[in-house]
């Protein structure tokens, strides 16, 4: 079996952008662009093996040695604090962590703040610094629904353009 560099790519837009960077750098894998359900894509000519994984799992594959290289967002590194070496910032998929709420929301500092997020460690750290009592509601998707349906007061989520927030009458809160 040939020696390969194993590269964990995050599924989705970021992964597609990053694969294009590897391809442009001379590490193509034409089969990755085929419409199929393969899990692993190899190019033995350049010694590269790519696999798509859930973004939150990229660092686990690297930390546990299944991948030599992984590309993950800073949000993943901050949330999970994996024991990995951060080589560089690719300056792609630029996003920001944001607290948002319904446009008309007014906070009551004497009341426990209900915070919906898929980043409970980041949210807890932020509100600990604010000395604010919170109740974290951990969700795995559609975080914006939580304040709309009254599940939470605010959300802590990663935002690229903010379009989804504004289209759903949410606004930056803090």
Question: Where are the language model's segments positioned?
Answer:
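Domain-level signature for soluble enzymes in the chorismate/prephenate branch of the shikimate pathway
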Residues: 1-174
């Amino acid at each position: 079996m040939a020696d390969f560099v194993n590269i964990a790519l995050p599924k989705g837009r970021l992964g597609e952008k990053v694969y294009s960077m590897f391809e442009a750098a001379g590490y193509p894998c034409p089969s990755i662009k085929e419409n199929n359900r393969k899990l692993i894509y190899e190019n033995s000519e350049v010694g590269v093996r790519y696999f798509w994984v859930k973004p939150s799992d990229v660092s686990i594959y690297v930390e546990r040695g299944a991948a030599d290289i992984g590309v993950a967002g800073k949000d993943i590194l901050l949330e999970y604090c994996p024991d990995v070496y951060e080589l560089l910032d690719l300056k792609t998929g630029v996003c920001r962590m944001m607290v948002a709420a319904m446009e008309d929301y007014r906070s009551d500092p004497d009341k426990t703040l209900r915070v919906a997020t898929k980043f409970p460690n980041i949210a807890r750290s932020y509100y600990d610094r604010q000395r604010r009592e919170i109740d974290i509601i951990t969700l795995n998707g559609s975080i914006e629904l939580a304040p709309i349906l009254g599940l939470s007061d605010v959300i802590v989520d990663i935002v690229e353009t903010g379009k989804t927030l504004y289209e759903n009458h949410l606004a930056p809160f803090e």
